[in-house]
Amino acid sequence: MDGGCIGVICDTVGRAQHAAELLGNHCGRDCVRLTHSRFMDIDRMSNERELRDLLGPDATIGNGKRPGKLVVVGTQVLEQSLDIDFDALETDIAPDDLIMQRLGRVHRHRRGDGECDRPVSLQTATFYIRGVEAWNKEGPKFSRGADSVYDAAALMESLAVLDLTAAGASCAQQLPQDIARTVRSAYGNDPHGFLPHMWLPQYDDA
Protein backbone atom coordinates (compact mmCIF):
# COMPACT_ATOMS: atom_id res chain seq x y z
CA MET A 1 0.00 0.00 0.00
CA ASP A 2 1.61 3.25 -1.19
CA GLY A 3 -0.71 5.52 0.75
CA GLY A 4 -4.24 6.79 0.91
CA CYS A 5 -7.23 6.30 3.16
CA ILE A 6 -9.02 3.07 2.30
CA GLY A 7 -12.30 1.71 3.65
CA VAL A 8 -13.19 -1.97 3.88
CA ILE A 9 -16.83 -2.77 4.68
CA CYS A 10 -17.68 -6.34 5.65
CA ASP A 11 -21.11 -7.90 6.06
CA THR A 12 -20.28 -9.70 9.32
CA VAL A 13 -18.16 -8.95 12.37
CA GLY A 14 -16.19 -12.14 11.82
CA ARG A 15 -15.26 -11.15 8.27
CA ALA A 16 -14.27 -7.68 9.49
CA GLN A 17 -12.06 -9.09 12.23
CA HIS A 18 -10.41 -11.49 9.80
CA ALA A 19 -9.82 -8.74 7.22
CA ALA A 20 -8.36 -6.41 9.85
CA GLU A 21 -5.96 -9.10 11.02
CA LEU A 22 -4.75 -9.84 7.49
CA LEU A 23 -4.39 -6.16 6.62
CA GLY A 24 -2.60 -5.45 9.88
CA ASN A 25 -0.04 -8.11 9.06
CA HIS A 26 0.40 -6.71 5.55
CA CYS A 27 0.23 -2.95 6.09
CA GLY A 28 1.25 -2.64 9.73
CA ARG A 29 -1.13 -2.64 12.65
CA ASP A 30 -0.69 1.09 13.27
CA CYS A 31 -2.26 1.76 9.86
CA VAL A 32 -5.40 -0.34 10.43
CA ARG A 33 -8.48 0.55 12.47
CA LEU A 34 -11.39 -1.78 13.20
CA THR A 35 -14.92 -0.76 14.08
CA HIS A 36 -18.08 -2.85 14.28
CA SER A 37 -21.40 -3.21 16.08
CA ARG A 38 -20.07 -5.45 18.85
CA PHE A 39 -17.98 -2.69 20.37
CA MET A 40 -19.47 -1.30 23.56
CA ASP A 41 -21.44 1.86 22.81
CA ILE A 42 -18.94 4.15 24.53
CA ASP A 43 -16.02 2.59 22.65
CA ARG A 44 -17.83 2.66 19.31
CA MET A 45 -18.80 6.32 19.77
CA SER A 46 -15.20 7.19 20.64
CA ASN A 47 -13.97 5.27 17.61
CA GLU A 48 -16.45 7.00 15.31
CA ARG A 49 -15.50 10.42 16.70
CA GLU A 50 -11.84 9.70 15.95
CA LEU A 51 -12.74 8.60 12.42
CA ARG A 52 -14.63 11.85 11.82
CA ASP A 53 -11.62 13.79 13.08
CA LEU A 54 -9.32 11.89 10.71
CA LEU A 55 -11.53 11.51 7.63
CA GLY A 56 -14.22 14.18 7.94
CA PRO A 57 -14.58 17.30 5.79
CA ASP A 58 -12.29 19.41 7.99
CA ALA A 59 -9.43 16.91 7.98
CA THR A 60 -6.97 17.60 5.18
CA ILE A 61 -3.44 16.65 4.27
CA GLY A 62 -2.60 20.35 4.40
CA ASN A 63 -3.66 20.86 8.02
CA GLY A 64 -2.09 17.58 9.08
CA LYS A 65 -5.31 16.00 10.33
CA ARG A 66 -5.89 13.55 7.47
CA PRO A 67 -3.42 10.64 7.58
CA GLY A 68 -1.34 9.79 4.55
CA LYS A 69 -1.99 6.09 5.05
CA LEU A 70 -4.92 4.46 6.82
CA VAL A 71 -7.17 1.42 6.36
CA VAL A 72 -10.50 1.41 8.19
CA VAL A 73 -12.20 -1.98 8.42
CA GLY A 74 -15.76 -2.17 9.66
CA THR A 75 -19.23 -3.54 9.29
CA GLN A 76 -22.38 -1.67 8.30
CA VAL A 77 -21.63 1.02 10.91
CA LEU A 78 -19.38 2.61 8.27
CA GLU A 79 -22.29 3.14 5.88
CA GLN A 80 -24.58 4.73 8.45
CA SER A 81 -24.49 8.49 9.12
CA LEU A 82 -20.70 8.83 9.40
CA ASP A 83 -19.53 11.86 7.42
CA ILE A 84 -16.21 10.37 6.41
CA ASP A 85 -14.39 10.22 3.10
CA PHE A 86 -12.22 7.44 1.66
CA ASP A 87 -9.88 7.56 -1.32
CA ALA A 88 -11.05 4.06 -2.30
CA LEU A 89 -13.32 1.43 -0.82
CA GLU A 90 -13.71 -2.34 -0.88
CA THR A 91 -16.99 -3.86 0.23
CA ASP A 92 -18.60 -7.21 0.62
CA ILE A 93 -21.44 -7.81 -1.79
CA ALA A 94 -24.74 -6.37 -0.53
CA PRO A 95 -28.16 -5.38 -1.90
CA ASP A 96 -27.91 -2.65 -4.51
CA ASP A 97 -29.24 0.21 -2.39
CA LEU A 98 -26.61 -0.51 0.26
CA ILE A 99 -23.88 -0.75 -2.37
CA MET A 100 -24.87 2.73 -3.53
CA GLN A 101 -24.90 4.00 0.05
CA ARG A 102 -21.43 2.59 0.65
CA LEU A 103 -20.20 4.05 -2.61
CA GLY A 104 -21.16 7.44 -1.21
CA ARG A 105 -18.26 7.15 1.25
CA VAL A 106 -15.73 7.34 -1.60
CA HIS A 107 -14.58 10.85 -2.61
CA ARG A 108 -17.38 12.25 -0.47
CA HIS A 109 -15.52 15.54 -0.04
CA ARG A 110 -13.36 17.41 -2.49
CA ARG A 111 -9.66 17.03 -1.82
CA GLY A 112 -7.93 19.78 -3.78
CA ASP A 113 -8.32 20.79 -7.43
CA GLY A 114 -8.97 17.65 -9.42
CA GLU A 115 -8.62 15.63 -6.19
CA CYS A 116 -4.90 16.47 -6.27
CA ASP A 117 -4.54 15.97 -2.51
CA ARG A 118 -5.26 12.27 -2.94
CA PRO A 119 -2.61 9.75 -4.05
CA VAL A 120 -2.23 9.91 -7.83
CA SER A 121 -3.53 6.37 -8.32
CA LEU A 122 -6.65 7.16 -6.27
CA GLN A 123 -7.67 10.50 -7.76
CA THR A 124 -10.45 8.68 -9.59
CA ALA A 125 -12.93 7.20 -7.13
CA THR A 126 -12.42 3.44 -7.05
CA PHE A 127 -14.71 0.85 -5.51
CA TYR A 128 -14.18 -2.92 -5.29
CA ILE A 129 -16.79 -5.56 -4.51
CA ARG A 130 -15.74 -8.84 -2.96
CA GLY A 131 -17.55 -11.84 -1.56
CA VAL A 132 -17.86 -14.06 -4.63
CA GLU A 133 -15.86 -17.24 -4.17
CA ALA A 134 -16.50 -18.65 -7.65
CA TRP A 135 -18.21 -17.57 -10.85
CA ASN A 136 -20.10 -20.61 -12.04
CA LYS A 137 -22.10 -20.46 -15.26
CA GLU A 138 -25.28 -21.15 -13.28
CA GLY A 139 -24.58 -18.26 -10.92
CA PRO A 140 -22.11 -16.88 -8.39
CA LYS A 141 -21.01 -18.89 -5.37
CA PHE A 142 -20.78 -16.44 -2.50
CA SER A 143 -17.98 -16.55 0.04
CA ARG A 144 -18.77 -17.98 3.44
CA GLY A 145 -20.52 -15.33 5.49
CA ALA A 146 -21.18 -12.99 2.57
CA ASP A 147 -24.68 -14.40 2.08
CA SER A 148 -25.47 -14.98 5.75
CA VAL A 149 -26.82 -11.46 6.30
CA TYR A 150 -28.59 -10.77 3.01
CA ASP A 151 -30.76 -12.97 0.82
CA ALA A 152 -28.73 -14.63 -1.94
CA ALA A 153 -31.31 -13.61 -4.53
CA ALA A 154 -30.86 -9.93 -3.61
CA LEU A 155 -27.10 -10.30 -3.95
CA MET A 156 -27.50 -11.82 -7.41
CA GLU A 157 -29.76 -8.92 -8.39
CA SER A 158 -27.15 -6.46 -7.16
CA LEU A 159 -24.39 -8.02 -9.26
CA ALA A 160 -26.59 -8.23 -12.34
CA VAL A 161 -27.89 -4.66 -12.25
CA LEU A 162 -24.28 -3.43 -12.02
CA ASP A 163 -23.35 -5.75 -14.90
CA LEU A 164 -20.87 -7.61 -12.70
CA THR A 165 -21.59 -11.10 -13.93
CA ALA A 166 -18.12 -12.59 -14.45
CA ALA A 167 -14.69 -12.59 -12.84
CA GLY A 168 -12.87 -9.33 -13.53
CA ALA A 169 -15.98 -7.46 -14.63
CA SER A 170 -16.16 -3.73 -13.96
CA CYS A 171 -18.65 -0.91 -14.28
CA ALA A 172 -18.65 2.87 -14.09
CA GLN A 173 -21.10 4.89 -11.99
CA GLN A 174 -21.66 8.64 -12.00
CA LEU A 175 -22.57 9.85 -8.52
CA PRO A 176 -25.01 11.01 -7.43
CA GLN A 177 -26.73 10.87 -10.84
CA ASP A 178 -26.74 7.08 -11.19
CA ILE A 179 -27.92 6.21 -7.68
CA ALA A 180 -31.67 6.55 -8.27
CA ARG A 181 -31.48 4.89 -11.70
CA THR A 182 -29.49 1.93 -10.42
CA VAL A 183 -31.73 1.36 -7.41
CA ARG A 184 -34.86 1.63 -9.58
CA SER A 185 -33.41 -0.94 -11.96
CA ALA A 186 -32.81 -3.35 -9.10
CA TYR A 187 -36.14 -2.93 -7.33
CA GLY A 188 -38.52 -1.61 -9.96
CA ASN A 189 -38.17 -4.27 -12.64
CA ASP A 190 -38.74 -8.00 -12.87
CA PRO A 191 -35.31 -9.48 -12.07
CA HIS A 192 -35.89 -12.13 -14.71
CA GLY A 193 -35.49 -9.33 -17.24
CA PHE A 194 -31.94 -8.35 -16.29
CA LEU A 195 -30.44 -11.46 -14.67
CA PRO A 196 -28.28 -13.65 -16.91
CA HIS A 197 -30.44 -16.43 -18.30
CA MET A 198 -28.17 -19.14 -16.87
CA TRP A 199 -28.61 -17.69 -13.37
CA LEU A 200 -32.38 -17.99 -13.30
CA PRO A 201 -32.72 -21.53 -11.84
CA GLN A 202 -30.31 -20.69 -9.00
CA TYR A 203 -32.04 -17.35 -8.47
CA ASP A 204 -35.49 -18.93 -8.27
CA ASP A 205 -34.21 -21.47 -5.72
CA ALA A 206 -32.52 -18.83 -3.54
How does the language model describe each region?
Residues 83:
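Flexible glycine/serine/alanine-rich "lid" or loop that lines and gates the nucleotide-sugar donor pocket
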